Amino acid sequence: MPTTEDAGSDFTRRRAAALLSAAARDLADRGASADDLFPRYLTAVPADLAAAVRAAIARPDPMAGWSVSRGLLAGFPDPGPTPESWRKAGAHDTAQLDIAIALIAASLGRVFGWAGQQDGRLVHNIVPSPGDENLQVGSSSLTELAWHCEDSFHPRRAELLLLVCVRDDDELGSRVSSVRRAELSEPEIALLSAPSAVIVPDDSYPDDWAGDDVRTATVWASPDGLCIRYDPAYTRFPEPSAGHRPAAPDSPPELSELSERAESPTPAGARSPVTTAPLLGSS
């Protein structure tokens, strides 16, 4: 699979890391947070910092959908013990790191948050949380997440997602793959292109985010290849007389086969993938 890792030279990454650290420290000292960074403290990322970040971060290859960048955040202080949930995360302890992540994201695109996710914060804390152990959400800890695309339920979901590994004592990785590697046949593409699936928000969203049963296609063509909206744990196939039925085991076999064809583990040491729309992910 074509992938891109660690764009630029060591000097490029060190320069970006130094600029990022200095900017984040200064902004945190002035009382900024990731959520009020724009426009209260900045109208845009400083040009030299944005250019350095873009030079240091590997943009995903369109066929792969992910890339790994290392070292940009290595100089930040330890954020303290892992909290029991995102609600108990200490904003002061992670202020510099959160600001740095927001600056990286804003250097690559327009940053936004979900009102129904972690009180609308731009930078989320994904930590194992009591009560979520067996759910198909990022805060689970005893179950393997099914292959899925992030926030598939929403037509205006992010085109670029940043995952930053802060602590990984058990050396666990993330699995990523692309629908463009699935080698789907023309009949399979035709079936999966029909707007038949209803994808609902996952269990990390409040109940009032359920929305309407809008049917959507699972795959569709774009100028640079197939794209996908896929989250089998939260997919339903409405029937006129029977309401909703689970995506598995009664969903079209082509939908289930997408997971089987997605098997492509992240290389050893790849802990912070930057992912794009065509990607399937699992942790």
Please place each PLM-identified region on the residue numbering.
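Hydrophobic, Leu/Ile/Phe/Ala-enriched alpha-helical segments that form helix-helix packing faces
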Residues: 53-60, 100-112, 255-263
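Charged, low-complexity intrinsically disordered tails and linkers
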Residues: 40-57
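Active-site environment of non-heme Fe oxygenases that use a 2-His-1-carboxylate facial triad
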Residues: 1-45, 62-77, 125-267, 277-281
